[in-house]
Amino acid sequence: MAPKPPSGTSSRAWDAVNPPLSEWVLDAVSSMGFTRMTPVQASAIPLFMAHKDVVVEAVTGSGKTLSFLIPVVEKLLRLEEPIKKHHVGAIIVSPTRELASQIYNVLTSLLAFHPASAAVINTSETEDVPRPKHSSSVLRVVPQLLLGGSTSPAEDLSTFLKRSPNLLVATPGRLLELLSSPHVYCPQSSFEMLVLDEADRLLDLGFKETLQNILRRLPKQRRTGLFSASVSEAVDQIVRVGLRNPVKVVVKVKGASGVDDKRTPASLQMTYLTQPPTGKFPALKHILNSVQPTPSKSIFFVSTCSGVDYLSVILPLILGNDFQLIPLHGKHPANVRQKNFNRFVNAHNPAILLTTDVASRGLDIPSVDLVVQIDPPSDPKTFIHRCGRAGRAGRRGLSVVLLHPGREEDYVSFLEVRKTPVAPFPHPITVSDAEAAAATETARKVVKADRAIHDRGQKAFVSWLRSYSKHQASSIFRVADLDWEGLGKAWGLLKLPKMPELKNFKGDKTLGVQMDWDTYAYKDKQREKRRLELLQEMAESGQQQTTNKKRPNETVAWSNNAENRNKKAKRRDMKQVRQERKRWEKMTEEEKKKALETEQMLEQIRAKNEEQRRLKRAAAKADKDAEEGGDEEFTGFD
């Protein structure tokens, strides 16, 4: 990569950019409250506007969005002539629906200060009609947002054909579907710029193939910008994207030593707290109460979608009524995700977003004061992105990662090596045994009230363990070191699930809970009705329903065991016959002929071997008889 050229001025004033920004852009950023550029904006905007490919790595919350939106908009509005109908001039790709929506909202806020573009956007948002008639010589930016799950591909194409947007903000899958249409054009004469936001995530395996298909549909002669908080960890993949001698912009933050060794904002305090499993959830309440002033918005990260579903039921009971807890994960339907996201963003009372890594990247949620990582991320790269939801744009923020005592504490040194140092949580927190036991009983009370919540908890625990076992720092997060009983009690489980990992566990899998599983009911009447019907059917068929592991009957007669073995052998033989019949039916006549010849040859060999074994047995018997006869005692003649 080409080195970054020296800047002509040390000023970060917006009017000092070279080439100069348009007057309406200066008005827009001033109205948004941005008095001067952030370091990443001061570095990236001039380069991107000067027709350079850029790879931008900057700490999260440093203003990367405007770093690419302003150059893209300026480029489209400085063309010699408007882009042709149904031709695309620029594309911004984002890994998630939420982040794409956020970029689109910032874009429309920016374009509100450009009269021609604002007129088109306002019309398209209020009426489902083609864009208003303007002089064909008027340059304007017409954006379209493409999100999977919110509209159908046919609806997106219809909107594209009606409004003829020249700037697309999209998630990868939906963008590829639109570009695959013969009615959408991206020729070299029209297409100008491609932006990959959160570039390292877009280049992950889940998006790699889709991204490659998108790039095949775009001209190679284009300006490309890659923006992320950790671009350096995907350099090999970035080079293959097709950038031409890109300029790399790296913006870091000075640590306490004065060296540029941190990859997070200086306004963000990153800490860790060590708690045993039973103390983790009660400690959350202590954390919330220790932060002053009380956090208006907090984000709690867990590792799985099932974990969000289950903990969203029990955590409010442990935390109390002072905070509104809102769940969000990637398996929610698109409308539920958007609804819950908006609830959190617009919440006036203290709110907590309980989420997975779907909310860890790029989202600029205002006023997030606290981030708690209940589960450390399985991918260490995600750690910095989770922390970065707080402390954005200079606002003070606090991040806490919860660790179990022992080997997990080595994660602190691991993060230090990765230039994301964490300090001990500044306020000592001690969770008493009585408080931990009370939290367990509080959770179990709601679990006992509805068998559906029990099922949800069992699923969530298994899912959590699967995620834990796949941690990339596997030498630190070891399944063998887990406190099973402590974890089960912490989660409010009534028993430990059946899992291969518990095969050699010698502890109490019932967790000290006595339950009548036959009478343990679902609140949902239909589910309970089905359960009772199944219970009745099993009772009538002589089977006993139990959720515990079946214990062997120590008084079973040998004859019953022999009968069971005979039944199994018979079933095995029948299965083998069916498989052989299916194999025979698939054969050609020639194959059948060869198979018969082979079988006949094998029969001859078997017969020959059996005859040899028979002769050997006969000879052995004769030798034995002779030996026994020779040893007889002589008793004399008659």
Swiss-Prot record:
<feature type="short sequence motif" description="Q motif">
    <location>
        <begin position="14"/>
        <end position="42"/>
    </location>
</feature>
<dbReference type="GO" id="GO:0003724">
    <property type="term" value="F:RNA helicase activity"/>
</dbReference>
<dbReference type="Pfam" id="PF13959">
    <property type="entry name" value="CTE_SPB4"/>
</dbReference>
<dbReference type="InterPro" id="IPR014014">
    <property type="entry name" value="RNA_helicase_DEAD_Q_motif"/>
</dbReference>
<dbReference type="GO" id="GO:0005730">
    <property type="term" value="C:nucleolus"/>
</dbReference>
<dbReference type="GO" id="GO:0030686">
    <property type="term" value="C:90S preribosome"/>
</dbReference>
<dbReference type="InterPro" id="IPR014001">
    <property type="entry name" value="Helicase_ATP-bd"/>
</dbReference>
<dbReference type="GO" id="GO:0000470">
    <property type="term" value="P:maturation of LSU-rRNA"/>
</dbReference>
<feature type="short sequence motif" description="DEAD box">
    <location>
        <begin position="197"/>
        <end position="200"/>
    </location>
</feature>
<keyword id="KW-0539">Nucleus</keyword>
<feature type="coiled-coil region">
    <location>
        <begin position="521"/>
        <end position="629"/>
    </location>
</feature>
<keyword id="KW-0067">ATP-binding</keyword>
<dbReference type="InterPro" id="IPR027417">
    <property type="entry name" value="P-loop_NTPase"/>
</dbReference>
<dbReference type="InterPro" id="IPR056330">
    <property type="entry name" value="CTT_SPB4"/>
</dbReference>
<keyword id="KW-0694">RNA-binding</keyword>
<dbReference type="InterPro" id="IPR011545">
    <property type="entry name" value="DEAD/DEAH_box_helicase_dom"/>
</dbReference>
<dbReference type="GO" id="GO:0016887">
    <property type="term" value="F:ATP hydrolysis activity"/>
</dbReference>
<feature type="region of interest" description="Disordered">
    <location>
        <begin position="538"/>
        <end position="638"/>
    </location>
</feature>
<dbReference type="GO" id="GO:0005524">
    <property type="term" value="F:ATP binding"/>
</dbReference>
<keyword id="KW-0690">Ribosome biogenesis</keyword>
<dbReference type="Pfam" id="PF00270">
    <property type="entry name" value="DEAD"/>
</dbReference>
<dbReference type="Pfam" id="PF23681">
    <property type="entry name" value="CTT_SPB4"/>
</dbReference>
<comment type="function">
    <text>ATP-binding RNA helicase involved in the biogenesis of 60S ribosomal subunits. Binds 90S pre-ribosomal particles and dissociates from pre-60S ribosomal particles after processing of 27SB pre-rRNA. Required for the normal formation of 18S rRNA through the processing of pre-rRNAs at sites A0, A1 and A2, and the normal formation of 25S and 5.8S rRNAs through the processing of pre-rRNAs at sites C1 and C2.</text>
</comment>
<feature type="binding site">
    <location>
        <begin position="58"/>
        <end position="65"/>
    </location>
    <ligand>
        <name>ATP</name>
    </ligand>
</feature>
<keyword id="KW-0547">Nucleotide-binding</keyword>
<keyword id="KW-0698">rRNA processing</keyword>
<dbReference type="GO" id="GO:0003723">
    <property type="term" value="F:RNA binding"/>
</dbReference>
<comment type="similarity">
    <text>Belongs to the DEAD box helicase family. DDX55/SPB4 subfamily.</text>
</comment>
<feature type="compositionally biased region" description="Acidic residues">
    <location>
        <begin position="625"/>
        <end position="638"/>
    </location>
</feature>
<comment type="subunit">
    <text>Component of pre-60S ribosomal complexes.</text>
</comment>
<dbReference type="InterPro" id="IPR001650">
    <property type="entry name" value="Helicase_C-like"/>
</dbReference>
<protein>
    <recommendedName>
        <fullName>ATP-dependent rRNA helicase spb4</fullName>
        <ecNumber>3.6.4.13</ecNumber>
    </recommendedName>
</protein>
<feature type="domain" description="Helicase ATP-binding">
    <location>
        <begin position="45"/>
        <end position="249"/>
    </location>
</feature>
<feature type="domain" description="Helicase C-terminal">
    <location>
        <begin position="283"/>
        <end position="437"/>
    </location>
</feature>
<keyword id="KW-0175">Coiled coil</keyword>
<keyword id="KW-0378">Hydrolase</keyword>
<dbReference type="InterPro" id="IPR025313">
    <property type="entry name" value="SPB4-like_CTE"/>
</dbReference>
<dbReference type="GO" id="GO:0005654">
    <property type="term" value="C:nucleoplasm"/>
</dbReference>
<dbReference type="GO" id="GO:1902626">
    <property type="term" value="P:assembly of large subunit precursor of preribosome"/>
</dbReference>
<keyword id="KW-0347">Helicase</keyword>
<dbReference type="GO" id="GO:0030687">
    <property type="term" value="C:preribosome, large subunit precursor"/>
</dbReference>
<feature type="compositionally biased region" description="Basic and acidic residues">
    <location>
        <begin position="574"/>
        <end position="597"/>
    </location>
</feature>
